UniProtKB/Swiss-Prot annotation:
Substrates-to-products reaction catalysed: adenosine(9) in tRNA + S-adenosyl-L-methionine = N(1)-methyladenosine(9) in tRNA + S-adenosyl-L-homocysteine + H(+); guanosine(9) in tRNA + S-adenosyl-L-methionine = N(1)-methylguanosine(9) in tRNA + S-adenosyl-L-homocysteine + H(+); an adenosine in mRNA + S-adenosyl-L-methionine = an N(1)-methyladenosine in mRNA + S-adenosyl-L-homocysteine + H(+)
InterPro entries with a match to the protein in the record: MT_TRM10-typ, MT_TRM10-typ_sf, Trm10_C_MTase_dom, tRNA_m1G_MeTrfase_euk, tRNA_MeTrfase_TRMD/TRM10
Name assigned to this protein: tRNA methyltransferase 10 homolog C
GO MF annotations, alphabetized: identical protein binding; tRNA (adenine(9)-N1)-methyltransferase activity; tRNA (guanosine(9)-N1)-methyltransferase activity; tRNA binding
Subcellular location: Mitochondrion matrix, Mitochondrion nucleoid
Similarity section: Belongs to the class IV-like SAM-binding methyltransferase superfamily. TRM10 family.
Length: 426
């Protein structure tokens, strides 16, 4: 008895603490009331989803549920087929344009204008992230182009303002004045350069650009190569004695052809040059061809006016050395490279030059024959200056002493050469 009394006393003492800590220890009526209050509170905040018990559902309800699932699946399949047929009938270019317009309305970085080729390139992108990156690239490119245009217009306006201030008032009022020198209009300059280009096509020395490297370049590198070709053609057109330019291995409908037609536009058919799908081997004899490549072991000493020089239209940013040299060897052609180490203190880096730099060097060699003048078109960031001329004269004397023709020179000619080289150094 005393043990039972002690246990009852302890239970009555601990009961209020248990009610506070654990609500489930309440009486049955209070527990039911607590649960109903919680259900009403939760139902007002979040709609509760009730899942039927599979064991309690009768078989008739299970059959109706299965029928509903079958009908829903069939309707979804019909919708997929209809959307697939509609997507096939719809133009993919129009769908891509709609996607771009939707992204523009959402405030994403999308260009305002883009060409058909850029749209086709966007269609070839597989994932959404690649499409987004490509559109961002076009957006940044368009913004940079607009910024350059604005900067160019501002510079032009700044240059024109002081010129207007320097002109007298009589000239400002009436532009038709008599001057000492005849004014050359742009139309007259175009006619003069056209005559020179026509003469070069008939009597000029050929210069061939090998266009068979479009498979070795990425689209961005090919665009860079076309920009260099445009610069080369303009430099040749403005020269006193231009080359007769050949674009050999130019496939009609190829990447090079499309980009050139896109850049030139209507002027492409009016250019005074020869564009052909034939190879340079089919047009000229192999004995008169010299392929210029930086990988050649043969160093170019002088410019030969009776030879036909070939320049590979290849922008190599992926470091593919020996590509043009291998092609020249495969065709059994003579190769040469520019004497950069002989005249320049070359620093680290490749000796590949751009197409417009090669054009300027060859034009200068053709007109002057001076390597010192021609190699001024090599970028100064690639070398540390010219070598001393006395070093070349000493090398020349050493070669002449070793050769058999040293004794055939008249007396005093070697000394005169030394004195002249010393005077040049002074």
């Amino acid at each position: 008895m005393p043990v039972l009394l002690k246990m009852s006393v302890s239970i009555t003492f601990l009961r209020p603490f248990a009610r506070v800590l654990v609500p489930f220890t309440l009486h049955r009526k209070r527990r039911v009331l607590y649960s109903t209050i919680m259900q009403r509170y939760m139902s007002s905040k979040i709609p509760a989803a009730s899942y039927p018990n599979k064991e309690s559902t009768p078989p008739s309800e299970e059959l109706e549920l299965d029928r509903w699932k079958i009908t829903m699946k069939s309707s979804v399949q019909e919708e997929d087929v209809s959307t697939a047929t509609s997507s096939e009938d719809e133009d993919p270019l129009a769908a891509t344009r709609e996607l771009v317009e939707m992204w523009r309305l959402l405030g994403k970085e999308v260009p305002e204008h883009f060409s058909e080729e850029e749209l086709k390139t966007l269609m070839e992108c597989v994932s959404k992230s690649s499409k987004r990156k490509y559109l961002k690239y076009l957006y940044i490119k368009e913004k940079m182009k607009k910024a350059r245009q604005i900067k160019k217009e501002m510079k032009k306006a700044e240059k024109e303002e002081p010129k207007k201030d320097q002109l007298p008032e009589t000239i400002k009022e009436d532009k038709q004045q008599n001057f000492l020198f005849l004014r050359l209009w742009d139309r007259n300059m175009d006619i003069a350069m056209g005559w020179k280009g026509a003469q070069a096509m008939q009597f000029g020395q050929p210069l061939v650009f090998d266009m068979a490297y479009d498979d070795h370049m990425k689209p961005k590198e090919l665009q860079n190569a076309v920009s260099q070709l445009l610069e080369s053609e303009g430099c040749n057109r403005r020269n006193v004695d231009p080359f007769h330019i050949y674009f050999c291995n130019l496939k009609t409908g190829g990447a090079y052809y499309k980009e050139l037609v896109k850049r030139y536009g209507e002027k492409w058919n009016k250019l005074l040059l020869t564009a052909t799908e034939k190879s340079h081997v089919d047009l000229f004899p192999k004995d008169s061809i010299i392929y210029l490549t930086a990988d050649s072991p043969n160093v170019m000493t002088t410019f030969k006016h009776d030879k036909i020089y070939i320049v590979g239209s290849f922008v190599d940013k992926n470091m593919q050395p020996g590509t043009s040299l291998a092609k020249a060897k495969r065709l059994k052609l003579a190769t040469e490279c520019l004497p950069l180490d002989k005249y320049l203190q070359w620093d680290t880096g490749t000796k590949n030059l751009t197409l417009d730099q090669m054009m300027r060097i060859l034009l200068c060699l053709k007109n002057t024959g001076s390597w010192e003048e021609a190699l001024k078109f090599v970028p100064s960031r690639k070398h540390a200056g010219y070598l001393e001329i006395s070093q070349h004269s000493q090398e020349f004397l050493n070669r002449m002493k070793k050769s058999k023709t040293f004794n055939s020179f008249p007396r005093g000619s070697i000394n005169r050469h030394r004195k002249s080289s010393l005077k040049e150094n002074i």
